[in-house]
């Protein structure tokens, strides 16, 4: 999505295969840019592998918590991200994290379908917050 502050790429890479595919797109389509990665993940996903796949190829990682009870705390995600990238920040929310991007040429938002939905809401591209509840399975 092109904005006045730069390009935002939203991807739902929430598993290792998705992260590999995203890394491929970044290296092929944006070879001359080291993007900022805004990432938030659910604790029950393979977040260590996803970070190891994506973080080495970005200039900065901004870790955020996802709007789900299953979220991995941003601080825990950031601790792991520091093993792969020198510039790692944490934010309480996607909105706060996006303020930290400073209008970078390319910002990649990824790690969770929930986070992708939050990003679309933040950009004014969706119907509303209530749609997020559709993915919260109750037994």
Predicted regions: what they are:
Residues 1-60:
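Nucleotide phosphate-binding/pyrophosphate-handling subdomain across enzymes
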Residues 7-9, 48-106:
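C-terminal helical cap/extension that packs against the catalytic core
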Residues 12, 40, 91, 109-110:
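Active-site-adjacent beta-strand anchor residues
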Residues 26, 30, 81, 123-127:
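Active-site catalytic pocket residues across diverse enzymes, especially alpha/beta-hydrolases
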Residues 39-43, 66, 111:
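Cofactor-binding loop segments of dinucleotide-utilizing enzymes, especially the Rossmann-like FAD-
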Residues 66-70, 130-139:
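Short, flexible loop segments at boundaries between secondary-structure elements
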Residues 97-125:
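A glycine-rich beta-strand to alpha-helix segment
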């Amino acid at each position: 999505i092109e904005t006045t502050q730069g390009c935002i790429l939203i991807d739902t890479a929430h598993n290792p295969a998705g992260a590999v595919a995203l890394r491929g797109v970044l290296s092929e389509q944006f070879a001359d840019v080291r993007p900022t990665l805004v990432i938030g993940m659910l604790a029950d996903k393979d977040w260590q592998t996803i970070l190891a796949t994506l973080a080495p190829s970005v200039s900065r990682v901004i870790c955020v918590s996802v709007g789900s009870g299953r979220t991995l705390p941003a601080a825990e995600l950031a601790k792991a991200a520091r093993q792969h990238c020198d510039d790692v920040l944490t934010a309480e929310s996607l909105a706060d994290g996006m303020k930290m991007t400073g209008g970078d040429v390319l910002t990649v938002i990824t790690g969770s379908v929930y986070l992708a939905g939050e990003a679309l809401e933040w950009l004014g591209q969706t119907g509303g917050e209530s749609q997020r509840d559709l993915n919260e399975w109750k037994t």
